[in-house]
A protein has these predicted regions:
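Conserved positions within compact, well-structured domain cores
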Residues: 1-189
């Protein structure tokens, strides 16, 4: 908006339990995948699929909502070379603005694939598609608004925007953001 802007990181947040270190993935389409099932306090590898609001306990994997009563943002930790509280999770109001409330919101996001990874593409308010690439809003291809949320009436929305790593670099340099659909956490799975 004219009075507020948010910044997205270069890639997914990742955590190394054995070293107690946080970092961002090198690319927006990078994600850990099945290795997330190794989640444990002493795991000597990187994970990037956390329980919601577990910034103070990133290896917590309970499936009970009562175990997550206090939200702790991951940004309270030092991430890479950044000091604690440099980064934070967007608020609900900020997500609502991006997907629903900003001018032309329905035309500024879509599902797509970057380098073979499915996810969501978010465009800035002042978007102009760069030459050499294309963009199709998923709302023109079967993603519908029901008055309170979007729902998918067509199962192939990820195929509407398919980019190679090089094509995505062009999109990213123009301000596009890609959030990989990396899965969901259910206990240690």
């Amino acid at each position: 908006s004219a009075d507020k802007q948010v910044t997205f990181s270069q890639g997914n947040l990742q955590y190394h339990p054995a070293n107690n270190k946080w970092r961002f993935a090198e690319n927006q389409s990078d994600y850990i995948g099945y290795a997330n099932s190794n989640i444990a306090a002493d795991y000597d590898g990187w994970i990037d699929l956390f329980g919601w609001g577990t910034g103070d306990a990133p290896t917590k994997s309970s499936t009970s909502y009562s175990d997550y009563s206090t939200f702790v943002d991951w940004g309270t930790n030092p991430i890479g070379a950044d000091a604690p509280n440099t980064w934070r999770t967007l608020t609900n109001d900020e997500w609502m603005y991006i997907f629903y409330n900003r001018h032309n919101a329905q035309s500024l996001f879509a599902f797509g694939s970057v380098n073979g990874v499915n996810g969501t593409i978010i465009l800035p308010d002042n978007w102009t598609t760069p030459s050499g690439v294309s963009f199709v809003a998923s709302t023109t291809q079967g993603l519908s608004w029901d008055g309170s949320s979007y729902y998918n009436s067509n199962d192939n929305n990820f195929s509407h925007n398919t980019y190679t790593a090089e094509q995505w670099q062009t999109m990213e340099q123009a301000g596009a953001v890609f959030l990989p659909a990396s899965g969901y956490r259910s206990g240690t799975d």
